[in-house]
Regions:
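Surface-exposed, short loops/turns at beta-strand junctions within beta-sandwich domains
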Residues: 174, 263-271, 713-717
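Proline-enriched interdomain boundary motifs that mark the N-terminal boundary
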Residues: 24-26, 206-215, 655-661
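Short, surface-exposed linear motifs at loops/turns and structural transition points
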Residues: 205-295
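HKD-type phospholipase D/PLD-like phosphodiesterase module
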Residues: 296-336, 350-515, 552-620, 624-625
């Protein structure tokens, strides 16, 4: 849409040249703007492959047409006279409603204008364009619906958008340099190309890469890069520690169509950039630049914590998975480990009623740790925890307004570049840093000790930060739709395969569906919401194939997708009945009870279009039987709670309490203190996690007065439950004893 100040001369000219419904050019129609009733003649440049919308073009310009009544009559190549009203739909001028359509038969399509990505603008809106020599970042993968794909032309980049129902869905994304034809469209000030079908991808003559670039066999000193070409040619790999590929090119001149090259002189725990090429008779086909990380020398352990009970049946060797009312203390303990660097991102942050995370961050800064902090700009007024940070700590708010939505990450990167590979830590998951999220809403945290993954998260952080030093640079920082798919996705951590995806650049939803569909026996999911029909379709496909699917969502009324999956899942679909809490998990488990590649999917990414295409999110996928068992146990306890249950859960939850017990991490229970908001007698009990009573006594609560629980006995290291009972309530809190 253009904003024009129409001069009196222009208005008089247009009025004189045509009546309101007299035939005018498309350029003249666009000048009249929204709400104008117009009639013009042009050529339809697309058919049903783009859905109901049609685009029409004449020698002066183009316009979109949206009409369920006339769409079936308008096909690619039709010459038509059309009448209707111009509207502004999210920045795109389109005719809606259409009042008349008069066909004049088939004609030749206009020649597309040859442009570059930066030239996609208002002047080309709704017109056919051609961009020569573009390379898709996701080349070799397959197209999915309702998804944008980035392509580059030299230093410039833009996107194509593939709608649901497009004939491109399931087709291979072109690899290497091609010429792209499509319609220049706009959505909320973002100009994009709409490719109609595979004929819009023009492959140059000569040798061409025809497969994805596979990077596998990750080792501490290298990896194997493989691809295929349509003709036999050379095998060339150009690589480096930066996108400049400064380490040079290695090649094998033996002509083959199945190419494989192993790099074996690389450094452990490093991120590398690589480009594959094949040449024949002077022609060269090159891939986009790919990113991968070598295996690190880290110990490679993985831990998960839940702020609610988990099923402990036959789990005598389980780690302490349930960290009820303790995730804040655990986070602080990890922050306290930082020796050199600490990068933090958080969506929602308030220290009220939790241990002060800000104090731990400040302490890290005061002991010489470089601290960088990113939070969501939309939450600036309520993220009170950021106000508790030292003024010297650099902070960056994500941009707001326009096409930006939310920075929804909740990750922490500790000592990513430490010379000791056993120091780097990544903390992430679904948990925000607030009382509600830590102590009430069901959530999880997953922690990795791995240098390659830590450097990957640092790379993502610095894309948003805009620099590699302590000062953010907003002139080059990228959030949301601006971000690029520029991080490794495959890792080997402690011998386990791990995948990592960041939204919205990495098309996480496509990976989610792909991972779901690997299930052979069972899937359990716990997710706050599902608003995408392609995920619902995947669930239906699994059930039709005999996979047992069980799921838990927060709210059945928030999406019509619920109607679809409830029909196929029946009583295996659970809904959070407690409106006082949010079932905030975003995880699923695949084949946890079999040997068929057990998988856990978790992170901050909700199962929605905004999460996939707009929000800043992160996702981890762990292929491991033990980790899958942890999440299966968490899911089972959420959907089959123990009654009575005085901890965070779905069917019973302590949402408010007149009693506070602190701290939750002590060397002995006698160090615990208690504060009450009422004056009344109470009983106090200390039990172990098997229910054995270790202490049972009485005390008098005093409003606002801190009471010492010095009467509690000494115990061995482990988890225990402190319960306080009054005449009308029971309060319980887990504590951890560590000597």
């Amino acid at each position: 849409m253009r904003n024009f100040t129409h001069s009196l001369f222009l208005l008089l000219f247009l009025t004189a040249s045509s009546s309101v419904f007299g035939q005018i050019t498309i350029a003249e129609a666009r000048l009249l703007g929204a709400n104008a009733n117009v009639t013009f003649r042009g050529v339809i440049t697309n058919g049903s492959e783009l859905g109901l919308i049609r685009y029409i073009q004449d020698a002066t310009g183009g316009l979109a047409i949206y009409s369920s009544n006339f769409a079936g009559q308008l096909n690619r190549g039709d010459s038509v006279e059309i009448s209707g009203t111009i509207v502004d739909y999210n920045g795109l001028f389109e005719l809606n409603p259409v009042t008349a359509s008069n066909p004049f038969g088939l004609t030749t399509l206009p020649n597309p204008q040859v442009v570059t990505p930066l030239q996609l603008n208002e002047d080309l809106e709704s017109e056919l364009v051609r961009l020569n020599g573009v390379v898709f970042a996701d080349g070799g993968n397959t197209f999915a619906g309702n998804t944008s794909y980035t392509f580059t032309q030299g230093a410039e980049q833009a996107t194509i958008y593939v709608r649901n129902g497009s004939p491109l869905i399931g087709q291979i994304i072109p690899v290497g340099s091609i010429d792209l034809v499509g319609i220049c469209s706009q959505y909320n000030a973002i100009y994009q190309v709409l490719a109609r079908d595979t004929n819009d991808f023009i492959v140059p003559p000569g040798i061409n890469i025809i497969s994805t670039i596979n990077i596998n066999n990750l080792q501490t000193n290298g990896a194997t890069i493989s691809w295929e070409t349509d003709l036999a040619g050379t095998t060339e790999v150009t690589y480096g520690l930066t996108p400049l590929l400064e380490l040079g090119t290695l090649s094998d001149n033996n002509p083959v169509t199945a190419h494989s090259f192993t790099l074996n002189t690389l450094l452990p725990g490093q991120i590398y950039y690589v480009q594959a090429s094949s040449s024949l008779n002077g022609d060269t086909s090159s891939s986009s630049i790919q990113v991968f990380g070598t295996q690190s020398l880290s110990a490679g352990w993985i831990k998960s914590y839940f702020n609610h009970d988990v099923d402990t049946t036959n789990g005598s060797t389980l780690p302490e998975l349930a960290q009820i009312n303790m995730l804040d203390d655990s986070l602080i303990a990890y922050i306290n480990r930082a020796e050199q660097t600490l990068d933090l991102t958080i969506y929602d942050f308030d220290n009220a009623s939790i241990s002060s995370v800000s104090d731990a961050i400040n302490a890290a800064y005061n002991r010489g740790v470089r601290v960088r902090f990113i939070s969501d700009g939309n939450q600036a007024a309520t993220n009170l925890g950021t106000l508790d940070l030292l003024p010297a700590i650099p902070q960056l708010l994500s941009p707001v307004g326009g096409n930006f939505t939310i920075m929804h990450n909740k990750f922490v990167v500790i000592d990513a570049d430490h010379e000791d590979p056993n120091k780097p830590i990544v903390w992430t998951g679904s948990t925000n840093w607030t009382d509600r999220q830590i102590n009430r809403d069901p959530n999880n945290v997953i922690i990795f000790q791995d240098q390659t993954l830590a450097r990957t998260y640092k790379l993502e952080f610095e894309e948003m930060w805009g620099s590699t030093n302590e000062n953010a640079d907003t002139t080059v920082s990228r959030f949301g739709f601006e971000k690029q798919d520029n991080t490794p996705h495959e890792f080997v951590i402690g011998g386990k395969r791990v995948e990592c995806y960041f939204s919205p650049s990495d098309n996480t939803n496509q990976e989610l569906i792909k991972t779901l569909l690997t299930a052979n026996d069972s899937v359990q999911f716990a997710t706050m919401l599902i608003t995408r029909y392609d995920i619902a379709n995947a669930i239906d496909t699994l059930i039709a194939n005999g996979v047992i699917v069980s799921g838990l969502i927060d709210d059945a009324t928030s999406t019509t997708v619920f109607t679809q999956i409830s029909a196929s899942m029946g009583n295996q679909l659970f809904v959070n009945p407690d409106t006082n809490i949010i079932m905030h998990h975003k995880f699923f488990v695949v084949d946890a009870e079999t040997e068929n590649d057990p998988i856990v999917w978790t992170g901050s990414h909700n199962w929605s279009s905004n999460a996939n295409t707009k929000n800043d999110e992160n996702t981890l996928v762990v292929h491991d039987a033990e980790v899958a068992d942890w999440y299966r146990r968490a899911y089972f306890r959420l959907t089959h709670p123990v009654i009575p249950d005085s901890t965070v859960g779905i069917l019973h939850l302590e949402s408010t309490s007149a009693v506070q017990v602190f701290p939750t991490l002590v060397n002995q229970p006698s160090a615990i203190q208690l504060v009450s908001s009422s004056n009344e007698p109470a009983s106090i009990q200390l039990t172990d996690m098997q229910g054995k009573i270790l202490y049972n006594g009485k005390l008098n609560l005093k409003k606002g007065q801190t009471l010492s629980l010095s009467m509690l006995p000494n115990v061995a290291d482990g988890l225990y439950l402190v319960s306080v009972r009054t005449s009308n309530s029971i309060f319980s809190k887990k504590i951890q004893v560590v000597n």
